[in-house]
């Protein structure tokens, strides 16, 4: 049987919002398997989490830059928020975004790209030597359309084009570029607020959908629902799930009546003067998935995990 550590309890608690003892039991029942523990809690009705969302903070900045039909979003990490507020670091992030807009989203290519008499990697090394703190280009994403716009939005901007969260979204259209730009920014703000996982149900990971279906079915069985009704209930439940995680099916935050994003985009075609198709989006939140030491919390839950 796997040893249940304080860190494991902490991660499950952050992911589900469930109490420490229930998290410990869920991990024990599932031999320390985190995903199985999440599903176990959901089947018990203790967690309403639709997906694994335990994101640990890291420092640095998200940068986003667009130029008409193309755009990029990058994440550059530092060790402390103090450095993220440093003008040299901020300038570094803006420079890397400009390079990424030219060479694309491959991190290795960005690092190898020339900057003055050096490279991006060299510029990062110079900044490390000057500022005295480790930093790295963690990831990058790019979008491009043949006609239309790529729009961006930075949430909690520290400087123009960089902050704690960044979104780019691509709109394919032959319509008015200025109107597309306004719509694109509104959509980017929506994506920042709602964190969709895919454009539509077809874009979701089939394994995620399978797990969701299985969790729902098991939950209703435990509630005593008749077997011949469960499939229909689950299908209705999946429709609700899609409205939560698929961009085109989400309730548009800029519409008071809550019409779906897909319908809002369709309605905007008259103003734009041509059909509009959202071809993709990226949403980067600072520190997604990066482990960071939180020793105080670990000490707090050590007793619940049976450690000293």
Curated annotation (Swiss-Prot):
It is found in: Cytoplasm. InterPro entries: EF-Ts_dimer_sf, Transl_elong_EFTs/EF1B, Transl_elong_EFTs/EF1B_dimer, Transl_elong_Ts_CS, UBA-like_sf. Coiled coil: none annotated. One of its GO terms (cellular component) is cytoplasm. The keyword Cytoplasm applies. Keywords: Cytoplasm, Elongation factor, Protein biosynthesis. This is Elongation factor Ts. Associates with the EF-Tu.GDP complex and induces the exchange of GDP to GTP. It remains bound to the aminoacyl-tRNA.EF-Tu.GTP complex up to the GTP hydrolysis stage on the ribosome. PROSITE patterns: EF_TS_1, EF_TS_2. Pfam families: EF_TS. Residues 80-83 are annotated as: Involved in Mg(2+) ion dislocation from EF-Tu. PANTHER family: ELONGATION FACTOR TS (PTHR11741), ELONGATION FACTOR TS, MITOCHONDRIAL (PTHR11741:SF0). GO terms for molecular function: translation elongation factor activity. Belongs to the EF-Ts family.
